Amino acid sequence: NLYQFKNMIQCTVPSRSWWDFADYGCYCGKGGSGTPVDDLDRCCQVHDNCYNEAEKISGCWPYFKTYSYECSQGTLTCKGGNNACAAAVCDCDRLAAICFAGAPYTDANYNIDLKARCQ
Protein backbone atom coordinates (compact mmCIF):
# COMPACT_ATOMS: atom_id res chain seq x y z
CA ASN A 1 0.00 0.00 0.00
CA LEU A 2 1.08 3.62 -0.25
CA TYR A 3 2.22 3.78 3.39
CA GLN A 4 4.47 0.75 2.87
CA PHE A 5 5.77 2.21 -0.42
CA LYS A 6 6.67 5.41 1.46
CA ASN A 7 8.61 3.33 3.99
CA MET A 8 10.39 1.43 1.21
CA ILE A 9 11.48 4.74 -0.33
CA GLN A 10 12.78 5.89 3.06
CA CYS A 11 14.71 2.61 3.30
CA THR A 12 16.53 3.04 -0.02
CA VAL A 13 16.76 6.87 -0.10
CA PRO A 14 17.09 7.91 3.56
CA SER A 15 18.58 11.29 2.59
CA ARG A 16 15.30 12.50 1.04
CA SER A 17 11.74 12.81 2.23
CA TRP A 18 9.33 10.44 0.47
CA TRP A 19 7.27 13.57 -0.20
CA ASP A 20 9.95 14.72 -2.68
CA PHE A 21 8.80 11.87 -4.93
CA ALA A 22 5.05 12.52 -4.62
CA ASP A 23 4.95 15.35 -7.19
CA TYR A 24 7.95 14.83 -9.43
CA GLY A 25 8.05 14.87 -13.22
CA CYS A 26 5.16 13.56 -15.27
CA TYR A 27 4.66 10.20 -13.51
CA CYS A 28 5.65 10.47 -9.84
CA GLY A 29 2.38 11.03 -8.02
CA LYS A 30 -1.19 10.46 -9.14
CA GLY A 31 -1.62 9.54 -12.78
CA GLY A 32 0.87 10.20 -15.53
CA SER A 33 1.13 11.06 -19.20
CA GLY A 34 3.56 12.16 -21.85
CA THR A 35 7.28 11.53 -21.96
CA PRO A 36 9.13 11.06 -18.65
CA VAL A 37 11.38 14.06 -17.95
CA ASP A 38 14.35 11.99 -16.67
CA ASP A 39 15.44 8.63 -15.25
CA LEU A 40 13.68 9.17 -11.92
CA ASP A 41 10.42 9.98 -13.68
CA ARG A 42 10.94 6.83 -15.78
CA CYS A 43 11.11 4.85 -12.51
CA CYS A 44 7.65 6.19 -11.69
CA GLN A 45 6.31 5.38 -15.15
CA VAL A 46 7.50 1.78 -14.76
CA HIS A 47 5.92 1.68 -11.28
CA ASP A 48 2.60 2.93 -12.68
CA ASN A 49 2.71 0.24 -15.37
CA CYS A 50 3.56 -2.37 -12.75
CA TYR A 51 0.50 -1.37 -10.69
CA ASN A 52 -1.63 -1.57 -13.85
CA GLU A 53 -0.44 -5.16 -14.32
CA ALA A 54 -1.11 -6.01 -10.65
CA GLU A 55 -4.66 -4.69 -11.00
CA LYS A 56 -5.31 -7.49 -13.52
CA ILE A 57 -5.15 -9.96 -10.60
CA SER A 58 -8.72 -10.49 -9.40
CA GLY A 59 -9.54 -8.16 -6.50
CA CYS A 60 -6.08 -6.58 -6.43
CA TRP A 61 -5.97 -2.89 -5.46
CA PRO A 62 -2.27 -1.92 -5.32
CA TYR A 63 -2.75 1.43 -3.55
CA PHE A 64 -4.42 -0.30 -0.61
CA LYS A 65 -2.97 -3.84 -0.59
CA THR A 66 -0.72 -4.60 2.38
CA TYR A 67 2.19 -6.99 2.04
CA SER A 68 5.02 -8.44 4.08
CA TYR A 69 8.53 -7.09 3.48
CA GLU A 70 11.76 -6.29 5.27
CA CYS A 71 14.21 -3.40 5.10
CA SER A 72 17.72 -4.13 6.31
CA GLN A 73 20.52 -1.60 5.80
CA GLY A 74 18.95 -0.21 2.64
CA THR A 75 18.12 -3.64 1.20
CA LEU A 76 14.47 -4.50 0.57
CA THR A 77 13.10 -8.04 0.57
CA CYS A 78 9.53 -9.08 -0.15
CA LYS A 79 8.81 -11.93 2.24
CA GLY A 80 7.27 -15.28 1.44
CA GLY A 81 3.67 -15.78 2.45
CA ASN A 82 2.33 -12.89 0.39
CA ASN A 83 -0.58 -13.90 -1.85
CA ALA A 84 -0.32 -13.26 -5.61
CA CYS A 85 -1.59 -9.69 -5.35
CA ALA A 86 0.54 -8.80 -2.32
CA ALA A 87 3.63 -10.34 -3.92
CA ALA A 88 3.09 -8.40 -7.15
CA VAL A 89 2.51 -5.07 -5.39
CA CYS A 90 5.46 -5.60 -3.05
CA ASP A 91 7.72 -6.28 -6.01
CA CYS A 92 6.42 -3.18 -7.85
CA ASP A 93 7.19 -1.02 -4.82
CA ARG A 94 10.55 -2.69 -4.12
CA LEU A 95 11.79 -2.24 -7.68
CA ALA A 96 10.63 1.40 -7.76
CA ALA A 97 12.35 2.21 -4.45
CA ILE A 98 15.58 0.65 -5.74
CA CYS A 99 15.20 2.58 -9.00
CA PHE A 100 14.71 5.84 -7.05
CA ALA A 101 17.94 5.20 -5.15
CA GLY A 102 19.90 4.91 -8.40
CA ALA A 103 18.39 7.87 -10.26
CA PRO A 104 19.57 11.48 -9.88
CA TYR A 105 17.05 13.91 -8.35
CA THR A 106 16.65 17.19 -10.24
CA ASP A 107 14.97 19.87 -8.12
CA ALA A 108 13.71 21.63 -11.27
CA ASN A 109 11.55 18.58 -12.06
CA TYR A 110 9.59 18.81 -8.79
CA ASN A 111 6.06 20.23 -9.08
CA ILE A 112 6.36 20.95 -12.81
CA ASP A 113 3.63 22.32 -15.07
CA LEU A 114 2.04 19.04 -16.19
CA LYS A 115 -0.01 20.65 -18.96
CA ALA A 116 3.04 22.26 -20.52
CA ARG A 117 5.56 19.43 -20.10
CA CYS A 118 3.66 16.15 -20.02
CA GLN A 119 1.61 16.00 -23.22
Swiss-Prot record:
Function of this protein?
A: Snake venom phospholipase A2 (PLA2) that has an effectively inhibitory effect on A-type K(+) currents (Kv/KCN) in acutely dissociated rat dorsal root ganglion (DRG) neurons. This inhibitory effect is independent of its enzymatic activity. PLA2 catalyzes the calcium-dependent hydrolysis of the 2-acyl groups in 3-sn-phosphoglycerides.
Any one GO CC term of the record: extracellular region
Protein family (similarity comment): Belongs to the phospholipase A2 family. Group I subfamily. D49 sub-subfamily.
| Keyword Disulfide bond listed | yes
- The name under which this protein is listed is Acidic phospholipase A2 natratoxin
Instruction: Recite the UniProt cofactor note for this protein.
Output: Binds 1 Ca(2+) ion.
Where, by tissue, is this protein expressed? Expressed by the venom gland.
Question: What's a GO biological-process term for it?
Answer: arachidonate secretion
Q: Does the keyword Disulfide bond apply?
A: yes
Cofactors named for this entry: Ca(2+)
Q: List, alphabetically, the Gene3D superfamilies matched.
A: Phospholipase A2 domain
Q: What is its main location?
A: secreted
Location in or out of the cell: Secreted
Q: Which cysteines are joined by disulfide bonds?
A: C11-C71, C26-C118, C28-C44, C43-C99, C50-C92, C60-C85, C78-C90
> What SMART domains does this protein's entry cite?
PA2c
Q: Which UniProt keywords apply?
A: Calcium, Disulfide bond, Hydrolase, Ion channel impairing toxin, Lipid degradation, Lipid metabolism, Metal-binding, Neurotoxin, Potassium channel impairing toxin, Secreted, Toxin, Voltage-gated potassium channel impairing toxin
Q: Which GO terms describe its molecular function?
A: calcium ion binding; calcium-dependent phospholipase A2 activity; phospholipid binding; potassium channel regulator activity; toxin activity
Q: Name one Pfam family in it.
A: Phospholip_A2_1
The record's active-site residues are H47, D93
Annotated EC: 3.1.1.4
**Organism this protein belongs to:** Naja atra
Q: What does the record give as the reaction this protein catalyses?
A: a 1,2-diacyl-sn-glycero-3-phosphocholine + H2O = a 1-acyl-sn-glycero-3-phosphocholine + a fatty acid + H(+)
Positions bound to Ca(2+): Y27, G29, G31, D48
